[in-house]
Curated annotation (Swiss-Prot):
Species annotation: Oryza sativa subsp. japonica
Swiss-Prot/TrEMBL induction comment: Induced by N-acetylchitooligosaccharide elicitor and infection with a compatible race of the rice blast fungus Magnaporthe oryzae. Induced by salt stress, methyl viologen, acifluorfen and cadmium.
Record's keyword terms, sorted: Endoplasmic reticulum, Heme, Iron, Membrane, Metal-binding, Monooxygenase, Oxidoreductase, Plant defense, Serotonin biosynthesis, Transmembrane, Transmembrane helix
UniProt-annotated binding residues for heme: 453
Name listed for the protein in its UniProt record: Tryptamine 5-hydroxylase
Chief location: endoplasmic reticulum
GO cellular component, one term: endoplasmic reticulum membrane
Bilayer topology: Single-pass membrane protein
Top-level enzyme category: oxidoreductase
Length: 523
């Protein structure tokens, strides 16, 4: 039976009132006689505290709050959960280096408990022996420099399918939805690398549907994550727990089919694929006697899904924002194309070996990370022990948010921070490798420390070869009649922050550098 609006509001008031009482009781029990110097805090609302700031575009709201309070570190109460927000590089460095061990864990989130098979992926696993083992496996086995290089053939093959599609099916008179192209590319690359198959784009396919549902659930708002005492009731009444259980069952079923195919050897390999995919690697590692913690079948599924979900969103969002800014800035676009075509010459295709010479293109990617970070609020950490940040006491079990969006637009850090100018990285030595282990901690698109994203080298390789190929083979512009100031830069917040509206562009084949490949016959 569906709840009426009146009954829903009554239930919400009851839930929030109960939460208020529980918070008050817990505070009274945990109060200490020892005074603490806590970070400043803005006025909050009864019961929910500052939870309203986390709706919509929280990175914008928190950046504005840090600015108006003149507080690079401030404290919030998200429901019954204490939290702090960092908006300056020196504090980010302190959190990710000096206090890395104290801030080594993750909050226990309901979506992670279900969809990460008991929080057993690298992203959501709590600090401890299992997380150390899982991260070591991912870094040394799945995403080592050698392994990332071997996946180059997959990246190139899927990219060439996109280039063939653009060559055969686009014209300047018919704008192309580049957002959809990038989403398909990211899904195809990650699906082949993770599962050894192409992403199923057709309607009715179970794997594609359940992966999309999992991504929606990971990105959604869960009241129990901010009122843990009320989680069982809240998730049951809202239907979220039922939805999570169904998605988990569907994920397990879909993954079981894939794993069984790998074990039995009955899967059909894509022609040309000879290297191990993620499932192959983890099945081999699972048998190793050297693991300090056993790697169960559910752990294996969690690690593979973690790499897929995190990798597709960040790759897609980065490519989308890069091309958005390039078509809005023809001068920068022209300069980037001239560099790519000079380096690649008449060879006819971009190879990953060319990327080291594309200095300006790498500055463009860095500038995009600064102005449009795919993850503007880094995945929150949780303190496992009390620590000190910026002279303030941070109690245990406090959630710690690092607002990279605020740091990227801070006029105290960057000249003309709202201007898209890749040259700022050229003058700062940005023409070298895209070293995201920034010693100044001004640029943190993939986090840092022991919780930094282990897959950033794979994502960067995909972004760089894709962008270089698009610049080499095609001419790009805004659709006829659309001015740069007309392009909507509004965002949608989720696992990665992407454009709210799809990016439509005018594209035509380059007369001098037209793509010619065997993939043309497949499209």
């Amino acid at each position: 039976m569906e709840l009426t609006m009146a009954s829903t509001m009554s239930l919400a008031l009851l839930v929030l009132s109960a939460a208020y009482v529980l918070v008050a009781l817990r505070r009274s029990r945990s109060s200490s006689s020892k005074p603490r110097r806590l970070p400043p805090s803005p006025p909050g609302w009864p019961v929910i505290g500052h939870l309203h700031l986390m709706s919509g575009m929280p990175h914008h709201a928190l950046a504005e709050l840090a600015r108006t309070m003149r507080a690079p570190l401030f404290r919030m109460r998200l429901g019954s959960v204490p939290a702090v927000v960092i908006s300056k590089p020196d504090l980010a460095r302190a959190a990710l280096t000096t206090n890395d061990a104290a801030l080594a864990s993750r909050p226990h989130l309901l979506s992670g408990q279900f969809l990460s098979f008991g929080c057993s992926d690298v992203t959501f696993a709590p600090a401890g022996p299992y997380h150390r083992m899982a991260r070591r496996v991912v870094v040394s086995e799945l995403l080592s420099a050698r392994r990332v290089a071997t996946y180059g053939a997959v990246r190139v093959k899927e990219l060439r399918r996109l280039l063939a599609h653009l060559t055969k099916n686009t014209s300047p008179a018919k704008p192309v939805d580049l957002s959809e192209c990038f989403l398909n590319l990211a899904n195809d690359v990650l699906c082949r690398v993770a599962f050894g198959r192409r992403f199923p784009h057709g309607e009715g396919d179970k794997l594609g549907a359940v992966l999309a549902e999992a991504q929606d659930l990971f990105a959604g708002f869960t009241i129990g994550d901010f009122f843990p005492e009320l989680e069982p009731v809240a998730s049951t009444v809202t239907g979220l727990r039922r939805r999570l259980k169904k998605c988990l069952a569907d994920l397990r079923e879909a993954c079981d089919v894939i794993v069984d195919e790998h074990i039995s050897g009955n899967r059909q390999r894509i022609p040309g694929d000879r290297d191990e995919d993620f499932v192959d690697v983890l099945l081999r590692v699972q048998k190793s006697p050297d693991l300090e913690v056993p790697l169960t079948d559910d752990n294996l599924k969690a690690l593979v899904l973690d790499m897929f979900v995190a990798g597709t969103d960040t790759t897609f969002a980065t490519l989308e924002w890069v091309m958005t800014e390039l078509v809005r800035h023809p001068r920068i676009l022209k300069k980037a194309q001239e560099e790519v075509r000079r380096v690649v010459g008449d060879s006819g295709r971009v190879e990953e070996s060319h990327l080291g010479e594309l200095h300006y293109m790498r500055a463009i990617i860095k500038e995009t990370f600064r102005l449009h970070p795919a993850v503007p609020l880094l995945v929150p950490r949780e303190s496992v022990a009390p620590c000190t940040l910026g002279g303030y006491d941070i109690p245990a079990r406090t959630r710690v948010f690092i607002n990279t969006f605020a740091m990227g637009r801070d006029p105290e850090i960057w000249d003309n921070p709202l201007e898209y100018s890749p040259e700022r990285f050229e003058s700062a030595g940005g023409g070298g490798e895209i070293d995201l282990k920034d010693p100044d901690y001004k640029l943190l698109p993939f986090g840092g420390g022991r919780r930094g994203c282990p897959g950033y080298t794979f994502a960067l390789a995909t972004v760089q070869v894709s962008l270089a190929s698009l610049l080499y083979h095609f001419e790009w512009a805004l659709p006829a009649g659309v001015r740069a100031e007309d392009v909507n830069l509004d965002e949608t917040f989720g696992l990665a922050t992407r454009k709210k509206e799809p990016l439509f562009v005018a594209v035509r084949k380059s007369d001098a550098y037209e793509f010619k490949g065997e993939e043309l016959s497949e499209v």
